[in-house]
Amino acid sequence: MDEIILMRKLKRKDEWALGKIIDLYSSYITCIVWELLHKKGTKEDIEEVVADTFISLWLTAERINYKKYSSVKSYLGMIARNKAKDWLRAYRGEILELNDDILLIDGKRKILLRYS
């Protein structure tokens, strides 16, 4: 089916169109996300980011100007990369929080807690 027709249906919140887009592009999106996350994330993390990509498409479908993008595939690829980068930022943030020195100020006392 033509991508333009799929996108028009998706804009009207046609669940069939979303299912068709998932069928067509889930392998492609999984490859993008795997490439960015396989060293840090688990299989479940990768699956979650892939799902988040399609959820984001669904939630923003009516606001997207599809003429701005060359194809549904390229638009989904952009969403997937952004979602994977968001995941990596959150992952790095968790790791940094665990390795940071924390300075607690209690009145006049300063206590330095070290996490190793």
Outline where the language-model segments fall.
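Conserved short alpha-helical segment within the catalytic ATP-binding HATPase_c
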Residues: 54, 58, 80-81
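ATP/adenylate-binding site constellation spanning eukaryotic-like Ser/Thr protein kinases
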Residues: 26, 51, 81
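Short, basic/polar amphipathic helix motif occurring as a linker/hinge flanking DNA-binding modules
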Residues: 87-107
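N-terminal module of bacterial RNA polymerase sigma factors
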Residues: 1-24
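Short, aromatic/basic-enriched loop-to-helix "N-cap" motif that marks the start
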Residues: 48, 62-78, 92
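Hydrophobic-face residues of short alpha-helical interaction/recognition segments
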Residues: 29, 33, 72, 76, ...
